[in-house]
Swiss-Prot record:
It is found in: Secreted. Restricted to specialized categories of follicle cells localized at the poles of the egg chamber. GO terms for cellular component: extracellular space. This is Torso-like protein.
Length: 353
């Protein structure tokens, strides 16, 4: 791989600062430029609460997008889960040794081709205080020597995906074809300008809906104990008493707030009211109360609307270069080096922050 001059970094920032004319729609096949908000994609994609507690707008996706192909609708399919009387989703928990694994777990269903750590496109710009607020925990518990369990209940609403590989001769939009012709092998400026004008990736699939989640914080010792117990017996193999005990305030170092991915105040109030658990004189709110409770899940089914992105698969623009392999190679070289530069310059890359 080639070494890159310092000028490339400045050039990239200067070129990418100009947004260009684009729409803003989450649609299959549309292209986006991940470098416009790399590390801060949650600003334009509703995936986790912003730090502003007051979020009246119910937008889901505000990232600029661009059509790259003509007549692609025939290759795309979508469906909605609306069957009454059942909960269209799942309940799951993830064990995280440290905060980086916690970030990774939250964005488990988000993939960006040619990125080894796609979650950093969303979390790379997080500092400890705003990361803690998004996750519903106190800042002291995201900086210390702790482990975590992420418990989440997800309600799927709409799913879209490409149902076939994009044909080699699928017609491109005229301006995309023009930009490809202007891309010069070995010319960094032309490659970065192409990314700015056309994009870096296209939407291959997505799922929208909403979720409730809660982060449980543990000392290393208690974390190892609960992880081994659940690993050996399985979640359904534990008694209800054991399950509640492991996720209780006397066993966990800290119980995070229950939050919704869309910061929906109505559903969060419902959770605080309906998911209270009382053990003698101790009262606390726990998402575990939903586990196996079909009545509560049915009530929650209608409350969790189509307000957030739950899964997203972004593919590189490789298909448009299939007849020009040398340009494809050059484009991907610039893309890969850009990713590495952004990763190195994000706050999460600096342990003192």
């Amino acid at each position: 791989m080639r070494s890159w001059p310092g000028l490339f970094w400045l050039l990239t920032l200067a070129l990418l600062a100009d947004g260009g004319r684009r729409e803003s729609q989450l649609r299959i096949g549309k292209a986006i430029n991940i470098f416009l908000r790399y590390g801060y994609l949650g600003i334009s994609m509703r995936v986790i609460p912003l730090n502003d507690n007051s979020e009246p707008d119910r937008w889901v996706f505000k990232e600029p997008t661009k059509n790259i192909y003509r007549n692609l609708s025939g290759l795309a399919e979508s469906h909605e889960d609306t069957t009454p009387g059942i909960f269209h989703g799942d309940f799951h928990m993830e064990f995280c040794e440290n905060r980086r694994q916690l970030f990774q777990a939250y964005f488990r269903d988000f993939s960006i081709e040619r990125m080894d750590k796609p979650w950093e496109a969303f979390t790379g710009g997080w500092f400890p205080d705003n990361a803690a607020k998004k996750l519903g925990i106190n800042t002291s518990f995201i900086q210390g020597d702790y482990s975590y369990v992420l418990v989440r209940v997800v309600r799927f609403r709409e799913t879209g995906r490409l149902n076939a590989e994009i044909p080699v001769h699928q017609p491109l939009e005229p301006d995309v074809r023009s930009r490809m012709d202007q891309l010069q092998i070995g010319n960094i400026t032309s490659a970065v300008r192409f990314m700015e004008d056309v994009g870096t990736h296209y939407v291959n699939s997505y799922t929208t809906g909403n979720s409730l989640y809660q982060v449980f914080v543990y000392s290393r010792k208690n974390y190892s104990m609960i992880k081994e117990r659940i690993k050996s017996k399985g979640l359904n193999g534990l008694s209800k008493l054991d399950l509640y005990n492991y996720f209780a305030p006397w066993f966990a170092a800290h119980l995070g707030q229950i939050r919704s991915a869309s910061a929906n105040a109505t559903v969060e109030r419902w959770a605080r009211r309906k998911l209270q658990y009382e053990y003698y004189v101790v009262k606390y709110v726990t998402l575990l109360k939903l586990h196996g409770n079909s009545t509560l899940l049915r009530s929650l089914d209608s409350l969790l609307g189509n307000d957030a992105i739950l899964q997203l698969d972004l593919k590189s623009l490789k298909p448009i270069f299939r007849e020009e392999p040398e340009k494809e190679s050059w484009y991907h070289e610039v893309l890969d080096n850009n990713v590495k530069l952004w990763e190195l310059n994000m706050p999460q890359s600096h342990p003192t922050r």
